[in-house]
């Protein structure tokens, strides 16, 4: 059940990640087609990283005395890796501590992205001030945290239904605008590799933004997903790894492509200068009228709860690694996440993304370094699993 809740939470992050692919400042403008090209190129080959994630966390997890079941993640397999190298037991190891701290920073940033996106969408759809939306989100999220089990069961049903609806609405939009598809792909490659962009340094900016949003959306390599996946009970670690590798493809290539096509099929002049939920909802209003704006607002509202539950689940094992098995520290981080949820709803759009980008960037650096020595374990488990399937 916990793994299902995490996977449901990822759906919301796909929409947030792709809708954030347009960013402006006074020096440069990064267009959605160009960023989407780099976004998909970076995200086309991340499944192997996800598989290598899930094998180590299944092999290096431990029992959770607070919540029951198991816990793990990069902080734990990094710790075991350093201990094996030093050949002595230690309470903390610096790389694992740095990963845990970076993770907690990142998930606070994601809390802000959630509320910022929902507040913006509710303002566009219902003219509700962001302050009121932020207060409502904090109150409802606090109730979810206190009654998590019942709520996760509801979300396990609601979120997949909303994701399917989102997918089929996108197919409808594509079918209606089928003649524009060739020109959309022409724009993608033209704005990604055009001489003007390369001469102005825009190529590097587009690549950087596509990488950041791609990493944010599917998390492959960052080390966040294994924090929750360690709780999964399976007879072979390879099964969890293969499922996650497929999940990365579905999450990114399917869900994020849906969001991108909605935006790119809208007239360029209509969405020029917009970003985030303003960009996505303006495009939806062009395609489906007021219904499209309201649908995105309600969809993101439901996705936000699953995403918030997911990041709190990610944080459990890292808080326990840093501060031990004490409920007071678990509760303190939940309160901090709720505070960041409130701040994000009324903060500037670029600020909330920057905090999440810093955290997830640091997480990825520490985690990727640790994955290389552990790759042998993952490959050995995969070969063993394949041989068992043949016999």
Set out the residue ranges of the language-model regions.
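Helix-loop-helix module between adjacent transmembrane segments
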Residues: 58-70, 79-116, 120-144, 298-309, ...
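Membrane-interface alpha-helices at helix entry/exit sites of multi-pass transporters
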Residues: 80, 85-97, 234-249, 325-334
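Extracellular/periplasmic helix-exit of transmembrane alpha-helices
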Residues: 56-59, 171-187, 201, 231-234, ...
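Selective recognition of specific alpha-helical transmembrane segments in multi-pass small-molecule
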Residues: 133-148, 159-179, 212-213, 238-265, ...
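Transmembrane helix-loop junctions in multi-pass membrane proteins
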Residues: 106-119, 141-154, 172-183, 261-295, ...
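A generic transmembrane alpha-helix motif of multi-pass inner-membrane proteins
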Residues: 329-383, 390-391
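Short, strongly patterned local motifs
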Residues: 1-20, 27-55
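Membrane-interface loop-to-helix entry segments
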Residues: 95, 103, 116-122, 126-176, ...
């Amino acid at each position: 059940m916990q793994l299902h809740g995490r996977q449901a939470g990822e759906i919301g992050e796909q929409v947030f990640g792709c809708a954030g692919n347009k960013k402006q400042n006074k020096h440069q403008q990064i267009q959605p087609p160009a960023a989407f090209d780099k976004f998909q190129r970076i995200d086309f080959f991340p499944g192997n990283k996800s598989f290598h994630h899930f094998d180590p966390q299944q092999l290096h997890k431990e029992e959770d005395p607070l919540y029951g079941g198991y816990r793990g993640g990069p902080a734990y397999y990094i710790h075991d890796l350093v201990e094996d190298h030093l050949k002595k037991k230690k309470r903390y190891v610096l790389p694992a501590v740095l990963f845990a701290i970076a993770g907690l920073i990142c998930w606070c940033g994601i809390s802000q992205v959630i509320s910022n996106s929902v507040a913006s969408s509710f303002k566009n759809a219902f003219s509700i001030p962001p302050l009121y939306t932020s207060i409502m989100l904090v109150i409802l999220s606090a109730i979810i945290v206190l009654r998590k089990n019942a709520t996760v069961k509801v979300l396990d049903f609601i979120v997949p239904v909303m994701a399917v609806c989102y997918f089929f609405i996108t197919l409808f939009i594509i079918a209606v605008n089928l003649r524009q598809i060739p020109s959309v792909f022409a724009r993608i490659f033209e704005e990604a590799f055009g001489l003007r962009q390369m001469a102005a340094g825009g190529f590097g900016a587009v690549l950087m933004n596509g990488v950041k949003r791609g990493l944010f959306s599917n998390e492959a390599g960052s080390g966040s997903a294994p924090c929750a996946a360690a709780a999964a009970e399976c007879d072979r670690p390879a099964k969890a790894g293969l499922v996650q590798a497929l999940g990365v493809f579905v999450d990114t290539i399917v869900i994020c492509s849906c969001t991108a096509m909605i935006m790119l099929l809208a007239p360029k002049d209509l969405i020029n200068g917009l970003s985030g939920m303003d960009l996505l909802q303006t495009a939806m209003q062009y395609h489906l009228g007021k219904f499209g704006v309201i649908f995105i607002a309600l969809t993101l509202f439901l996705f936000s709860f699953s995403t918030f539950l997911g990041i709190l689940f990610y944080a459990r094992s890292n808080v326990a690694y840093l501060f031990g098995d004490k409920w007071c520290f678990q509760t303190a981080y939940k309160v901090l996440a709720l505070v960041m949820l409130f701040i994000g709803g009324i903060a500037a759009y670029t600020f909330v993304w920057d905090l999440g980008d810093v955290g997830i960037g640091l997480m990825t650096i520490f985690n990727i370094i640790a994955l290389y020595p552990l790759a042998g374990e993952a490959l050995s488990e995969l070969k063993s699993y394949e041989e068992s399937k043949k016999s």
